[in-house]
Amino acid sequence: MMIAGTPMSAKKALQQGVIDAISENSLMEDAIAFLQEKIGSNEHPKVRDKNEKVLEARGDENVLAEAKALAAKTRRGQFAPGQIIACVEAAINEDDFDVGMKKESDYFLECLMNPQREAMIHIFFGERAASK
């Protein structure tokens, strides 16, 4: 998803734990109900403490093999996909959440400074304009 840039449906995001809930009716009412439910429970985990999936992947050399192969095949010569993979590797292998976040921030800044960034923005908006 991150490398290919393909969108994910809300239902799939919910199933995979990317989001906590989907609003089916009034966003405001659903948001208030969601918050009241969270306030009423004793569980208030921070994102930084939700590491079950990361711990499962730690030490598995093959966990990012598919992403690396996809990047090599479909994003050859592009800078950002390698940085995305490096961010995920840091999240998996770094014990300290703050150190992992710092690495992600550094990789992101490298993407911002890379000359490909501006070219990719032009391509994106050019494709949008051409499809209208």
Which ranges hold each PLM region?
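Amphipathic alpha-helical segments at domain termini/boundaries
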Residues: M1-Y107, F125-G126, S131
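Short, structured interface segments
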Residues: M113-K132
